[in-house]
């Protein structure tokens, strides 16, 4: 599947938000790249909606076609469409690995999943977009536990708060999904209603 692999800091500056988390280069220059980056650009309603959609896509590392499918699924749910969309994005396995503190960024989490380091409910899973469910159990595979990424994760455990809807247990770094997150539990700088308005046109 196609994936954006370009400079993430440049994309962060274009969209006005840190897509990585702790990106020092973005913090130094949080304005769009290029010679006119500091110039004020009048935001139209459409531009704001498009930018919010792009922020969500690049935050979670999802291509447009798949993101549109997530939106269409969210529309079919009984809750608020924007909130349901965020719940879907948060339930991706790569995001769960990131939220649990086993990877510094979502991009790194995606690589760890793709390289086959995890099982879900005892079944080997290497698809970053795999969707977890309530009561799922995610384990680091035995032959991966002592590799560098997971050693670092153990050493830095507690550096980043873990959301209350999941739990990391013991030295084996088992992840327990207590529930799927509610909107108040999702800390991400997005205004999801703008995304709904973008696709509702």
From Swiss-Prot:
Enumerate the spans annotated as S4 RNA-binding domain.
Answer: 91-157
Q: Which InterPro entries match?
A: Ribosomal_uS4, Ribosomal_uS4_bac-type, Ribosomal_uS4_CS, Ribosomal_uS4_N, S4_RNA-bd, S4_RNA-bd_sf
Please indicate which superkingdom the organism of origin belongs to. Answer: Bacteria
Instruction: Tell me one GO molecular function of this protein.
Output: rRNA binding
Q: Do the record's keywords include Isomerase?
A: no
UniProt cross-references to SUPFAM superfamilies, sorted A to Z: Alpha-L RNA-binding motif (SSF55174)
PANTHER family tied to this protein: 30S 40S RIBOSOMAL PROTEIN, SMALL RIBOSOMAL SUBUNIT PROTEIN US4M
General function of this protein: One of the primary rRNA binding proteins, it binds directly to 16S rRNA where it nucleates assembly of the body of the 30S subunit. With S5 and S12 plays an important role in translational accuracy.
Protein name, per record: Small ribosomal subunit protein uS4
Q: What is the lineage of its organism?
A: Bacteria, Bacillati, Actinomycetota, Actinomycetes, Mycobacteriales
